[in-house]
Regions:
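Cytoplasmic-side transmembrane-helix entry/capping segments in multi-pass membrane proteins
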Residues: 11-18, 43-46, 71-86, 135-144
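Transmembrane alpha-helical segments of multi-pass membrane transport proteins and ion-pumping complexes
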Residues: 20-21, 25-29, 48-61, 87-96, ...
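The feature marks the first
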Residues: 1-20, 28-31
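C-terminal ends of transmembrane helices
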Residues: 1-5, 56-73, 123-133, 179-187
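Helix-coil boundary and interhelical linker segments in multi-pass alpha-helical membrane proteins
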Residues: 29-39, 93-109, 154-164
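Short, highly charged, low-complexity non-transmembrane loops/tails of multi-pass membrane proteins
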Residues: 189-196
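Loop-to-transmembrane alpha-helix initiation sites
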Residues: 40-46, 106, 137-146, 158-169
Length: 196
């Protein structure tokens, strides 16, 4: 996104970093982890910065070369799969953090921190880039995180942490992947009465 918006190297890094750790920071503030864990353990920040630098470098090298359709197809599918897995993992990691930090966290709080961990960084990134947040306009994204969080929470006490987290991640992945693959969206109201 930052490259398409013609942001410089710092902009690419900041948006990449925001996407990677923004949701976790919001989650930690909600559950009372101060300073947030993602700024105490810098592995996520380091991986995000390295990835942003690599993306910037590749985009710079290939900036004027035509991109073949087959490459775009492979890239888009790889991005979809990795994004779907990442959304699922971040969602259940957020729930896990709340379970370990709080005594008897309520259902709503668990869903909230799971979803915020999953989509919060991207939401903040889109706002910083001046776009409508992707999670509200494109494919089923936050909804997949919500459903995966519900599955994870429901199974947590029944089948244990590991199975619950695997099932939650799998649910998010499956819903997200199928929604993107088949262009499924939540309904919106369209019409001349509702245009900006």
């Amino acid at each position: 996104m930052a490259i398409k918006k013609q942001m410089d190297l710092l902009g690419v890094i900041v948006l990449g970093l925001t996407t990677a750790i923004g949701g976790g920071i919001i989650r930690d503030v909600i559950i009372g982890v101060i300073p947030p864990s993602s700024v105490q353990d810098t592995i996520y920040a380091k991986v995000s910065i390295a990835t942003s630098l690599l993306v910037f470098l590749v985009a710079y090298i290939y900036r004027d070369r035509p991109i073949k359709y087959s490459f775009k197809l492979v890239y888009n599918n790889l991005l979809l799969v990795s994004d779907s897995i990442g959304l699922g993992l971040f969602t259940v990691v957020g729930i896990n953090a709340a379970y370990h930090r709080l005594n008897s966290p309520g259902f709503f709080l668990l869903v909230l921190v799971g979803v915020v961990t999953g989509v919060g960084g991207g939401l903040v990134r889109d706002i910083m880039a001046g776009d409508k947040p992707y999670i509200f306009v494109k494919h089923i994204y936050a909804s997949a995180s919500i459903l995966g969080a519900i599955v994870c929470i429901y199974l947590w006490d029944i089948s244990g942490q590991s199975i619950a987290m695997l099932a939650g991640t799998s649910t998010v992945f499956l819903i997200r992947f199928l929604a993107a693959r088949f262009k499924l969206d939540l309904p919106i109201i369209q019409g001349h009465n509702f245009k900006e």
